[in-house]
């Protein structure tokens, strides 16, 4: 993994945009922590909350998130005579570290983001879904997501995503 500040320093010496691939070290490591809580409020209602943090000094191997806070609620369909159905709503706010912001603003590319024109603002995601049991073990879910400041850029978005999923339980 490469260190963002090392890539910035190298770019200042050589010119051009910072690039973490040029400063990768086999011994580089990263760390972080996360907390998750899920709680049934009743037989039909559940809530969740998650919080995670890492220093954000090195490139990511999975997602470009240094800190995240999310929460939501799900309600089973028993209240409207559809006990196998579920409706849910959730919200997440994600951010990156100051060294990654600087790296991206100077033209660096991360695992999934970067175009050299970062106007940083926290990414905010709203999601809602409805999962319906349509036949025996077949469930169909409709999903909507709205992302404000996608890829941490206030000059982008918001974007809307609509999804349809099928799930079979065996």
Region locations from a protein language model:
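Hydrophobic, lipid-facing positions within transmembrane beta-strands of outer-membrane proteins
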Residues: 31-35, 51, 67-73, 124-128, ...
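Outer-membrane beta-barrel "beta-signal"
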Residues: 89, 158-170
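Residue-level signature of outer-membrane beta-barrel architecture
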Residues: 39, 75-77, 132, 168-170
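Short loop/turn motifs that connect adjacent beta-strands in outer-membrane beta-barrel proteins
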Residues: 43-44, 77-87, 134-137
């Amino acid at each position: 993994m490469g260190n963002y500040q090392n890539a910035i320093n190298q770019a200042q010496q050589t010119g051009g945009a910072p690039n973490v691939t040029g400063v990768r070290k086999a011994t580089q490591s990263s760390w972080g922590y996360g907390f998750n809580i899920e709680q049934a409020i009743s037989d039909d209602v559940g809530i969740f909350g998650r919080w995670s943090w890492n220093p954000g000094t090195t490139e990511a191997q999975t997602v470009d998130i240094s800190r995240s806070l999310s929460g939501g609620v799900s309600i089973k369909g028993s209240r409207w005579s559809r006990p196998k159905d579920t409706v849910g709503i959730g919200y997440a706010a994600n951010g990156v570290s100051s060294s990654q912001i600087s790296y991206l603003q100077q033209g660096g590319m991360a695992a999934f983001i970067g175009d050299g024109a970062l106007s940083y603002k926290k990414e905010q995601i709203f999601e809602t879904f409805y999962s319906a049991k349509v036949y025996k073990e077949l469930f169909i879910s409709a999903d909507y997501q709205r992302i404000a400041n996608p890829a941490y850029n206030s000059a982008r978005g918001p974007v809307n995503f609509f999804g349809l999923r099928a799930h079979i339980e065996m």
